[in-house]
Amino acid sequence: MSGLTEFFRGDISRASRVALLVVALALIPCLFLPVWNIGLKAPQYPQGLELKIYSNELTGDLQEINILNHYIGMAEIEPDEFREFIFIPFFILRFLGFAVLAALVGRMPIAAIGYIDFSVFGAVMMFDFQTWLTRFGQGLASGAPLTIDPFTPKFLGVTSIGQFEVTRYPAAGGTIMLLAGALGPVILIYELVRRRRAAS
């Protein structure tokens, strides 16, 4: 236990500091690129419809998708209802700041706190996204032109809803964030191996 405590109190190598700077630089485009993509195919729209979720806004074929939502009794998507758009950009900047600070100072505690913060935020956002999807899928109004049973959409993958097929997957910004997050365990393993070799 004391060895593990000592590890998390120690310094990080130059290679890991460079990797953290790469993470910081990679997070900058996430402020401007779409994070998640929702695609929809329907008989009325054979070319498909698309919603792009950014860190601070929702764009795409919102009007047409709301028409289809009305067709099955689903509530309209109102971008102003998503309060998450207010604070997500600030969290991205916060993670960027942690990465830069850890790289400049070279201390494991800062890197560890930043990664834990990033991981918790990612888990909370996925849960939040799934909660919104469940609310829309389970809250179908009666008397809609097309009657379907309430359902729980998946935040990732393909869902068939009556005559519609809905796909959800990470867009460019989301992919970058996932890759940046994956560097955390890589840095941790690298530092563990480096410390053990130095101690032997």
Predicted features by range, described:
Residues F32-F85, Q130-R168:
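Long, glycine/tryptophan/cysteine-rich extracytoplasmic
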Residues I189-S200:
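Membrane-interface capping segments at transmembrane-helix boundaries
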Residues S2-N37:
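Hydrophobic secretory-pathway targeting helix
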Residues S13-A24, F98-M125, R197-A199:
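Interfacial segments of alpha-helical transmembrane regions
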Residues V22-A26, E84-P109, T175-V186:
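Hydrophobic alpha-helical transmembrane segments
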Residues A24-W36, I113-L140:
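Hydrophobic alpha-helical membrane-insertion segments
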Residues L4-R14, V105-P109, I161-A172:
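Juxtamembrane loop-transmembrane helix junctions in multi-pass integral membrane proteins
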Residues S160-Y190:
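C-terminal structured interaction module
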